[in-house]
């Protein structure tokens, strides 16, 4: 069996074959780029002389993500099941387990066409497709757990390399107290370009639904804007917001936008290059400066 990087454990592959049913065997496997909290492999399955592909997402046991992943697998399984029959290009669940004896936590899914695409020929069209897809997601009548912020407001402070500490302090003071959202909807919760698949400049899939929930739409918009800012610029992030507002017919609440943007911190300079993995140029030193620009613009919209 050909190998690429970390091999899935034998007992996990045995679970895959058992889940797929009689006559199925894993012929090949390849680890896919990305996956900060999990390991993702594309599996080639042989059955009755034919080959098909599926995707295996699994987590190492006893990692720092152990508590989270035991909740993430059933959550994503439930959400993907609810998405079946909708027009959102999400994977379909083949099987899932949290049983460590079977190699869990693990999630076996259908493979969607396409791959992560960070350097489009037409960025405007790229952003438009992202905004249109998010509008469609937010329009879904799908239930989910209530939104919980990733921010610990007590720990917020300007990044060590901040050149505009005043902007950070203003933003932190703004979100010091909770604010009720003006509207709520179904959220992907980690909507950004690393969780989108593209083929021939067309958005073909949205993956990683483990944090899906119900909350303010700005949570998704702001998180995507954060990721666009650190990789590209505040201008690109603002253009995404403008397209989303035009497509959805709703104005993005700047308070919730700022709250989402404040998820940026020093660790982004460490993990973002790992996520990008050479697929796009990245100015690491300029990340905080770009975030200051997008935060200042968001604050001006209040």
Stretch-by-stretch model annotation:
Residues 21-28, 248-257:
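Short, surface-exposed acidic
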């Amino acid at each position: 069996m050909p190998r690429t990087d970390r091999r899935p454990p034998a007992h996990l592959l045995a679970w895959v074959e058992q889940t797929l049913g009689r006559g199925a065997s894993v012929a090949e496997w390849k680890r896919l780029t990305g996956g900060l909290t999990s390991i993702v492999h594309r599996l080639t399955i042989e059955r009755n002389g034919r080959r098909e592909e599926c995707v295996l997402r699994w987590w190492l046991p006893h990692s720092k993500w152990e508590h989270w992943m035991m909740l993430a697998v059933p959550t994503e399984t439930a959400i993907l099941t609810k998405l079946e029959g909708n027009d959102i290009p999400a994977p379909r669940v083949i099987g899932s387990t949290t049983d460590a004896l079977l190699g869990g936590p693990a999630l076996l899914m259908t493979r969607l066409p396409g791959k992560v695409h960070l350097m489009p020929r037409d960025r405007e069209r790229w952003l438009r497709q992202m905004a249109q897809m998010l509008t469609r997601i937010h329009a879904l009548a799908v239930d989910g757990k209530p939104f919980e912020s990733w921010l610990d407001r007590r720990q917020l402070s300007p990044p060590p390399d901040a050149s505009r500490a005043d902007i950070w302090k203003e933003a932190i003071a703004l979100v010091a107290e909770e604010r009720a959202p003006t509207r709520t909807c179904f959220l992907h919760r980690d909507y950004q370009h690393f969780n989108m698949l593209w083929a021939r400049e067309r958005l073909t899939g949205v993956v990683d639904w483990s944090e899906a929930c119900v909350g303010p739409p700005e949570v998704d918009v702001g998180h995507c804007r954060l990721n666009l800012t650190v990789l590209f610029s505040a201008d690109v992030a603002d253009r995404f917001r403008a397209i989303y507002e035009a497509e959805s017919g709703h104005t993005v609440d700047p308070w919730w936008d700022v709250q989402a943007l404040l998820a940026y911190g020093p660790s982004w300079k460490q993990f973002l290059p790992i996520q990008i993995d050479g697929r796009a140029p990245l100015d690491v030193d300029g990340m905080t400066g770009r975030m200051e620009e997008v935060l200042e613009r968001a604050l001006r919209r209040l």
